[in-house]
Amino acid sequence: MSDSDTGRASRLVVAAAVLDNLEHPTTLLCAARSYPPEHAGQFELPGGKVEPAERPEQALARELDEEIGLSVRLGPELVVPRQLAVAAPPNNGPGDDAPAWPAMHGFRMRVWLAEPAHPGERGRAGGDHQRLEWVRLDPPDQLRRLPWLEADLPIIDAFVVRLGR
């Protein structure tokens, strides 16, 4: 039985729903993967792995800077619904005690809303992402039209509900 089958997963990853503006959002930053081949071109929320002894929020800021060259201001966490939540394992890292979204390969993912630290910053593709797109939030089904990684679909649905769209 895998970790995800038991309701627990091991490694924590973090991602951000980067909005153009947290107060009055009109667009969301969506990142198309470069690899592996079976996921190339599929979209995800940008982020990455939390290193040992690193707080999730610190990891997210570091990963966004490294992966897409974007400094952000974090907003609230997008809380996972209880029926989808994956519990933190015993001996988890600092700040890693919250339930998380199930992610690919048995990882657990926590997601925060965010906005660019410097208005007008757009980020850059490269490395893990072949392209970045700022997608309009209206109409709400526009986000669902993108070819998302399967694990990100429930997160996108919860995000749209959170925005009340």
Feature names for model-found ranges:
Residues S71-P81:
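A short coil-to-beta-strand element that immediately follows conserved catalytic motifs
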Residues R145-R165:
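Charged phosphate-binding loop/patch that engages nucleotide di/tri-phosphates or the phosphate backbone
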Residues R11, R82-R122, D128, E133-P140, ...:
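Active-site-adjacent beta-strand/loop module that shapes the phosphate/pyrophosphate-binding cleft
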Residues V18-D20, A32, E115-P116:
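Residue-level signal for short segments within beta-strands and strand-turn junctions
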Residues M1-S10, L22-H24, N91-D97, W101, ...:
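Short, low-complexity, intrinsically disordered N-terminal peptides in bacterial proteins
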Residues V50, P140-L143, I156:
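A generic structural signal for short hydrophobic patches within well-formed alpha-helices
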Residues H24-E67:
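Conserved Nudix-box catalytic region and its N-terminal flanking loop in Nudix hydrolases
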Residues S2-L28, K49, V80:
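Conserved N-terminal beta-strand and adjoining loop/helix that marks the start
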